[in-house]
Structures are given as C-alpha cells and as structure tokens.
Amino acid sequence: MCELYSKQDTLALRERHIGPSCKIFFAADPIKIMRAQGQYMFDEKGERYLDCINNVAHVGHCHPEVVKAAAKQMELLNTNSRFLHDNIIEFAKRLTATLPQELSVCYFTNSGSEANDLALRLARQFRGHQDVITLDHAYHGHLSSLIEISPYKFQKGKDVKRETVHVAPAPDTYRGKYREDHEDPSTAYADEVKKIIEEAHSSGRKIAAFIAESMQSCGGQIIPPAGYFQKVAEHIHKAGGVFIADEVQVGFGRVGRYFWSFQMYGEDFVPDIVTMGKPMGNGHPISCVVTTKEIAEAFSSSGMEYFNTYGGNPVSCAVGLAVLDVIEKENLQGNAVRVGTYLMELLSEQKAKHPLIGDIRGVGLFIGIDLVKDREKRTPATAEAQHIIYEMKGKGVLLSADGPHRNVLKIKPPMCFTEDDAKFLVDHLDGILTVLEEAMDSKSGTVFSENTAYRTKMPKEIQVELPNLSATEAREIPRGKRNGVCSDQQALLSKRLKT
C-alpha cells in the first residue's frame, strides 16, 4: 500500500475531517498502520507489531482464503437480499449447525450494533413487553437503542438511564458484590436479577429481555460463575421475557472447546436469541441474529417487513463462509486451547512474581489481566495499566486496557496466535512490570497518580468447572478437523486463575 500522506499530515487531516468523538488507539502516540498479515500489523516505517487486541481479524489479517472468496464473489454478483441466491442459505445452514437445534432462524445484518438493535426489536415484539435488564459495565453497541442499555457508555456521558432499562450487578467474582469466597455467587447474582423483575412488576412494568455478553469484554473480561445464566434465564422466562446472548466479541471459537461462548455454561442453557458480529467477516461488515421459530413468527406477525439492503448480500455471505472454512481447516479452536492454555500458564508464573497482577482470568484466547496497586484491597492500578500498554507498544506488542477502572489488560488476538507469540508477549510484559514495580517500591508504592503529567498524556478514551490441563498436555491435543464445535479430545477450556 502506498502512503498518501506523512503521519503528521494524516493526523492533521483526521483532526480536520473526522469527528472528535471518534477515538484511536494510543492517542498520545498513535500508530499509522499500512498493512497487516496474520497476527501482525506494520506501520509506515515497516515496523512490525504483534496484534493482541484486534478480535475483528479473527482468522488472521488478510487471510488469503477470505480475500479470495470476497474477490471471486465480487466479480460474479453482489446485490441486495431480496434476490434469491445460494450464499445466504448456505451460510445460514452452516451457522445454525453450530448452534442448539432450537436456534434455527437467521436475520443477517452488517454490524454487531445492528444485530443487537434487531434483537431488542424481536424481544419486544414477542410478547409486547418493553423493559430490558442489562448488566453493569455492559456495552452492546453504538446505536441510540443500545447506548440506552450500555452502562459502559451512558454512565460516562450525560445520558440518563431510561425507566425501561434496569441494571443488574455484573457477575464479577473478583471485585464485584459477591466474590469468590461467597458460598453461592451464581445464585446471589441471579437473585439480583430476580429482585429487579419483582420491582419492575410492582410498578406495572413488564420485562421484554435480559441481554448479556456470554463473557463481558469491555466490562473487564468477566467470566460469570457456573450456573448464573441458567438461573437468570429461569427468572426471565417466568417474567415472560427472553434471554439475549451477545456473542459479538466472544463467538466463533474464541474460547476453544466451544464454538459459542454461551455453550461453556452447559447444555441446559440455551438463549432465545443470539447475536454475532465482529469476527464473523474477518473485518468485512457482516453480522447476524439467530433465534427460534416462535420468536421469528411473532416478529413477522406485526405485518412489518424486515429488510436490510446489505444484510446477507452475496459477497458478505461468501466471506462469512470462508471464515467458517478457515476455522475448521486450520483447527483454530484447537489452537485457541493449546495457545490459550500455554499463555495462561506463563501468566500464572508472572502473577506469582509480580504483585501488580491481582487476577488473571480467561478462556481460550480471551484473557484479562487485572492490575492492582494492593492485592488485599484490590485497588485498581489504572495509571499503571496505561503506562504498560504504551511501553508494550514500544516493544512491538499491541494491548489495550478496559473495564470500569480501565485497569484490565485485554488479550484477544487473532486466532492464529502462536506459542512463540505468547512467549514474546509475556517476556516483554515481565520486563516492563519488573521495571515499573522497582520504581513503585522506590516511591512508596505508586509511580503514577490520576493527576500526574504523565496521566494527562494518556488517551481518555466462569467461573466454570474446568479440567486442570498443563501446557504440555494441551499441545498434545489432536489437530483433527470437525464441523462446528470441537470435540473434548480436540480442545479443553483454559482455567480461571484464582487470587
């Protein structure tokens, strides 16, 4: 790719022509990316960066099979979804084959936000109820209907929570209301949802849906305790509502053993609606809502046609099919287990070594490192997290920090991430943490405060029962091919490390 402008000119033109609310990574010192391949990105100087946060390029940046599928279909046909063509049917068939039998009807859209917006419409049409229960710190998209149900956004701005929206505590067993030492955190958190339902009913309100990411991403890489979703679904169904599982950031095999993250919680948990996006097209805009026939028929009974000009177009579906093919052919679910297990093992060693690491939680290639100033108090190390991501960038590793305190390092790399990549990441993290902690010790426990000059430069921008698996055992998992969900022999979940 030829560089049109210098980095300085690109920044100046962006400031002039792009809205100021459109933020970029590393705003204090942004990277100008010119090309990417696999798990690597390259700047205008040819410097290589290991991409550990871009879960859009799911099977790897510019994967040749995906590029080929897009170009081939673009040369042949691209049109709107009112014309009959095979790609949309084949894609719907392949997608639903990875899901429980009840989830059999697809609506194709173009982004995760579109998918979640449509999911709300389906839920509200189903029984005519209007209220929605969401989790604290949740983010479900940028549309007005989704900002309303995203505390991650509306709590930071001037928007006021609408009376149709109810916020339940995030099921965080590390720093939430009910922690790992609670006798039954799943029931305690689910009872919070039950309480919200009862209070809504006492005010004459009716619950249309409960919506949650199968694992909270922007909320801090949170994995709910086992049994939580089952209990919540029971309460929601009794209230006449539906359960929406948002898989936009965590689906398509990222957790390893399962194709969809909600499947980690057991066969007795089946959402009524599943939304998907981001990795679905490996960077191409495509998303989908999958639901039951009953809910789809209720939506149709309104008499209003649902039409999305580009949703399910031939090119998008060809790209989506290619992504599914690559996941299967390259056994990327198995890779997520092998590399994820190895990475968690390396990080557990770092946790024992570095007091700044309060908690490590993750499944497959979805991992969060919760940084703290004090392990006992679990005081979020927000400024330190920002320092670390900039230092890691200087070492050629791209990370970001998120969560309500922006102190959780997010690791969500392309699925072709290797063990060598994992070691490269951890080796540099180890070095940076060592230097930082030495500086903190010399200054009585803190280097950066929220008000330091350094801080002002920063961008403002399941727990489940799992087998104990060593990295060696994980690497010995067979690399066999299989359509849909990997078998137990192919993949096992990474375990969540406790404090």
UniProtKB/Swiss-Prot annotation:
Question: Which GO BP terms apply?
Answer: cellular response to glucocorticoid stimulus; ceramide phosphoethanolamine catabolic process; lipid homeostasis; phospholipid transfer to membrane; response to food
Q: According to the UniProt entry, what is the EC number of this protein? A: 4.2.3.2
The protein's required cofactors:
pyridoxal 5'-phosphate
Q: Which UniProt keywords apply?
A: Lyase, Mitochondrion, Pyridoxal phosphate
**Gene3D superfamilies this protein is in?**
Aspartate Aminotransferase, domain 1, Type I PLP-dependent aspartate aminotransferase-like (Major domain)
> What is the catalytic activity of this protein?
phosphoethanolamine + H2O = acetaldehyde + NH4(+) + phosphate
Q: Which residues are modified to N6-(pyridoxal phosphate)lysine?
A: 278
For this protein, the record's InterPro entries field holds: Aminotrans_3, Aminotrans_3_PPA_site, PyrdxlP-dep_Trfase, PyrdxlP-dep_Trfase_major, PyrdxlP-dep_Trfase_small
SUBUNIT field? Homotetramer.
Q: What is this protein called?
A: Ethanolamine-phosphate phospho-lyase
What organism does the record attribute this protein to?
Mus musculus
State which gene encodes it.
Answer: Etnppl
